[in-house]
Amino acid sequence: VPLRNNYYLTIQMVNKNIIWWLSGIMLLGALFRLSIYNLEPLFMDSAYYASLGRSIAEGDYLLQVNHMSDKPPLFFYVQALFFQLLGVSASVAVLPSFVGGMMGIGIIYFLGRDLKNSAAGLLAAFLFAISPMSVWLSATGLIDSLFMAVTMLSFWTLLHRRYYWTGLLIGIALGMKQTILSFGPFYLLCLLILELHHHSGKEAFHSVTKSIFKMMPGFFIVFLPVLYWGMFLTSEKMKLLKWTTGFVSGKHDPQFVGTSLDRLSFLQSGLGEVVGLSWHWIIGLFILSMLLLMGKIYQQWSLKRQLELNDKLHFCYNLFTLFFFFLLLFVAQKYLAWYVFPVFPFLILTGSITLVELLNTRYLSWNRNARGKIIIGILGTITLISAFSSATARVNQIGEDLRNSPYQGVQEVIKVIKPYLMNGNSFIF
């Protein structure tokens, strides 16, 4: 009994320490985001999204105002809710993005914890908290930050086989941005891995089918209203998947913008925004992660043992990252800086799990003793300090760029967007 009491006391102390560490990381993430919060005046996309949220808050509940948005309406309703609660202003318009960024820090901790352990979760949360692009998207009025928080949460519920909630969250993500459709193969592969790990033969097939049906009620609760709005209420009368097919087939942009080689250089630059370090670090950790996973697969195969579920899912995450890179380089009609952001959480998870794995691995002969672990620990600490220093410098640079950006007045904005609006002076603050 005394031993059991000591065990529970130790667990409570560990949990309390984790709470303190995670709270500190959340505070750090908030400080990074507040340092550049709403520094740039709302313009173009962010101003336009806010205008639609304002229209809803002022009584256009079905959002029938003439508009040119290529996004589903759910994010605009979230902005409208904040406007109703806190008043209509530019700073409130940015608040949903800030909340999404803070949610993402907590959610990626739970993903890292459940895929590896608490150390990997805390490391992932720290890296996501200081990620320059995550910080930037959290401090502007764009959709991506909240969208990725919901997407990460959907994968966490999938990991725990809470399929109704997974379906609901996929529906919410689709209600904000069609990018979630590119995650379709990822969801299916993760589902197959989960069910085939717990079942075999015909039972696995029935379990997969049953799981998909469990997702459907939650998904359609959100999807059907969005579909009805898109087809019958909005002035654009959006056709089903119109913008997605345009993204792939080029109906709206028949020219493939740039070359794949040009996009590769843009991708390298974008990867530098993951944690502020050079893309060489990100790709290096990614390749090392794949090598470690392949080593585990070979070892378990030679021993005729089943690979652990967490390793299967981690390998799946890496495959999806490669698939998304392929879409950006060879399929998408155009490439913008933040298009790579949807894979940032998975790159951060991969890097965090790999660094923690290096402290425990037995594959490398020079890491079989305490001395090897100390060396790896020192290298890991240097990497984290470098990441923090680089991320801080990059966020400061972003802040300077935002402070020095030319202010776009009401008349300039109206001049650009007025042809697409019925009432040109009702959409901006």
Task: State what each model feature region is.
Residues 20-30, 170, 285-295, 301-330, ...:
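Transmembrane alpha-helix segments characteristic
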Residues 23, 27, 95-115, 153:
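Transmembrane-helix motifs of polytopic, lipid-linked glycan transferases
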Residues 26-32, 124-129, 156, 170, ...:
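Short helix- or helix-capping micro-motifs
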Residues 43, 133-144, 336:
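Short acidic/glycine- and proline-prone juxtamembrane loop motifs at membrane-interface regions
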Residues 107-110, 126-127, 136, 146-165, ...:
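Specific aromatic-rich, kink-prone transmembrane helix
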Residues 166, 407, 418-429:
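Short periplasmic/luminal acceptor-recognition loop of GT-C membrane glycosyltransferases, typified by
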Residues 184-199, 203-310, 323-330, 387-393:
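Transmembrane-lumen/periplasm boundary regions of multi-pass, lipid-linked membrane glycan transferases
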Residues 373-420:
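Membrane-proximal, lumen/periplasm-facing interface regions of secretory-pathway glyco-
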